[in-house]
């Protein structure tokens, strides 16, 4: 750069610093790029699939899927993991449906969880913005986008048309929120539901998420949660097998996926993941129905082995560390169909 250009640039940078504060514009080479902090999801496989050990701090995250697929369970695990390391968390319960007893079972410190049950969408999003601006809250969960009903719709008569109101509300709120959460280091997680596109035919998925396209654009991470099987013991349902696809990821390679068990009343089965990934990585030996580790038997059958690991936390932690150290892309990578990527460009 010649001297005249350098002088002009230096003058411009001084004017910007004076107007907006020192460090508003930085040259990347002047400062070491720091790794992105994360909050664990509570799932070993999903943490690795996300590429940075969990969901990124200071970003907007969308978790979506059909009803009863495990979306709220996943967010409660995020809250529990954040609280374990001293994080302050808030739950904006727009659906007025939070099960406090279930949250406790998952490890959430409900006594120190801030909760709000707003009357309408604008109030909910104002609460989220105010909490984020405080800089004191690490994680905010909104359950759910579909329940963020605009005030005019609530106060209107049944049958009134309110086309696009919620989409405009979300678009306006996210434009304001994105910069705030990044500056303050607050993670904001939106739970969203799936709807069928009206008149969808031919190419592409007939599914879409509620609240318009703004959240798809502003979210740094989008997780698609699906139930793939019901877990049974003696013909009695005891949980669900769930697959989570990372369909968008701005902080690590996308399109990875993870599978894990969600047990009724207990949440994500970490012991089940330890066995699954331990066997895949040859850390745990499987011979017939027996599972063993380091020449010691864990149990006969998956459920008995899970019970052993739950009772022997030191062994479970040891295997977990080996899994995290040895987990490779070959296990976690899973291509997402092009039609499922639609709208994420």
From Swiss-Prot:
Gene Ontology terms: cellular component: cytosol
Alphabetized InterPro entries for the sequence: AAA+_ATPase (IPR003593), DNA_recomb/repair_RecA (IPR013765), DNA_recomb/repair_RecA_CS (IPR020584), P-loop_NTPase (IPR027417), RecA-like_C (IPR049261), RecA-like_N (IPR049428), RecA_ATP-bd (IPR020588), RecA_C_sf (IPR023400)
A GO MF term: single-stranded DNA binding
Q: Which domain of life is it from?
A: Bacteria
UniProt cross-references to SMART domains, sorted A to Z: AAA
Recorded hits in SUPFAM superfamilies, A to Z, give: P-loop containing nucleoside triphosphate hydrolases, RecA protein, C-terminal domain
Chain residues that bind ATP = 65-72
Q: Which residues form the signal peptide?
A: none
One of its GO biological process terms is:
DNA recombination
UniProt keyword Transcription, yes or no = no
- Give its localization: Cytoplasm
Which UniProt keyword terms apply here?
A: ATP-binding, Cytoplasm, DNA damage, DNA recombination, DNA repair, DNA-binding, Nucleotide-binding, SOS response
Main location class: cytoplasm
Family (UniProt): Belongs to the RecA family.
User: Could you tell me what this protein does?
Assistant: Can catalyze the hydrolysis of ATP in the presence of single-stranded DNA, the ATP-dependent uptake of single-stranded DNA by duplex DNA, and the ATP-dependent hybridization of homologous single-stranded DNAs. It interacts with LexA causing its activation and leading to its autocatalytic cleavage.
Indicate what this protein is called per its UniProt record: Protein RecA
Species of origin reads Campylobacter fetus subsp. fetus (strain 82-40)
């Amino acid at each position: 750069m010649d001297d005249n250009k350098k002088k002009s640039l230096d003058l411009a940078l001084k004017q910007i610093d004076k107007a907006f504060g020192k460090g508003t514009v930085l040259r990347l080479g002047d400062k070491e790029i720091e790794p992105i902090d994360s909050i664990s999801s509570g799932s070993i496989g999903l943490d690795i699939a996300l590429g940075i050990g969990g969901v990124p701090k200071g970003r907007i995250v969308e978790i979506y899927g059909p009803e009863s697929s495990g979306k709220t369970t996943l967010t409660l695990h995020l809250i529990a993991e954040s609280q374990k390391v001293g994080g302050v968390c808030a739950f904006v319960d727009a659906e007025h449906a939070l099960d406090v007893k279930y949250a406790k079972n998952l490890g959430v410190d409900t006594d120190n969880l801030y909760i709000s049950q707003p009357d309408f969408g604008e109030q909910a999003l104002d609460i989220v913005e105010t909490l984020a601006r405080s800089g004191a809250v690490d994680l905010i969960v909104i359950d759910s986008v579909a329940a963020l009903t605009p005030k005019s719709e609530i106060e209107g008569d049944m049958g009134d048309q309110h086309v696009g109101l919620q989409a405009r509300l979300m678009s306006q709120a996210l434009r304001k929120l994105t910069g705030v959460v990044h500056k303050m280091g607050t993670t904001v997680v939106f739970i969203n539901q799936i709807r069928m596109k009206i008149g969808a035919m031919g190419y592409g998925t007939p599914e879409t998420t509620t609240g318009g396209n703004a959240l798809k654009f502003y979210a740094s991470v989008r997780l698609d949660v699906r139930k793939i099987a019901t877990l049974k013991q003696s013909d009695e349902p005891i949980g669900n097998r769930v697959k989570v696809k990372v369909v968008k990821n701005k902080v690590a390679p996308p399109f990875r996926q993870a599978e894990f068990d969600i047990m009724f009343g207990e949440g994500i089965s970490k012991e089940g993941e330890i066995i699954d990934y331990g066997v895949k990585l040859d850390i745990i030996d499987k011979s017939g129905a027996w599972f063993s580790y380091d020449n010691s038997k864990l149990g006969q059958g998956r459920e008995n082995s899970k019970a052993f690991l739950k009772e022997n936390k030191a062994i479970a932690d040891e295997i977990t560390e080996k899994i995290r150290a040895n987990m490779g892309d070959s296990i976690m990578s899973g291509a997402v169909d092009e039609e499922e990527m639609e709208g994420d460009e």
